[in-house]
Amino acid sequence: MAVGKFSEPLNNYIRENKINNIYISSFIPQKLILSKTDVFITSGGHNSILEAIYYKVPMLITPISSEQRMNGLLLEELGIGETTYSLNKNASISSQINKLLRKQLNVNKLNEISNDLRNQNNNFKSMWDYIYDN
């Protein structure tokens, strides 16, 4: 989990509570994570959504702004993601993540959109490689 300036207090909390399956950092290379993950929990910003689609990763959107709420609704309509409006609803979030992990969404649609994105923008990979390396 990338949390910027909040990484130290969250790491302290994780150590104190002996939580072993969460990694906290001020920066995490998102492309690397997306290339190896099954579900992406994100606030639903445009670039994060594009990167998740590129890597064919279903998303759980936890929107903060109205744009992100709209993005979540669009992903739900396409069948390639879920949206939650409260991180306090643990049971709801758990069931949404399980739904995404069980591929109870439109995997064909996610593959189709990802392939379209890759084909329409032949320089997408090289652009991100350039940004990441520089």
Provide a role label for each language-model segment.
Residues M1, L60-I61, E82-T84:
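Short hydrophobic alpha-helical runs that function as membrane-insertion/retention elements
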Residues M1-V39:
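Donor-nucleotide binding loops and adjacent catalytic segments primarily
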Residues K5, N47, S65, N88-K89:
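Residue-level "edge-of-site" marker
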Residues N11-R15, L73-E77, N111:
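Class I S-adenosyl-L-methionine
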Residues Y54, E76-I80, L105-L110:
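Short acidic (Asp/Glu) and glycine-rich catalytic loops that position anionic groups and cofactors
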Residues S92-N134:
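C-terminal amphipathic helix plus adjacent low-complexity
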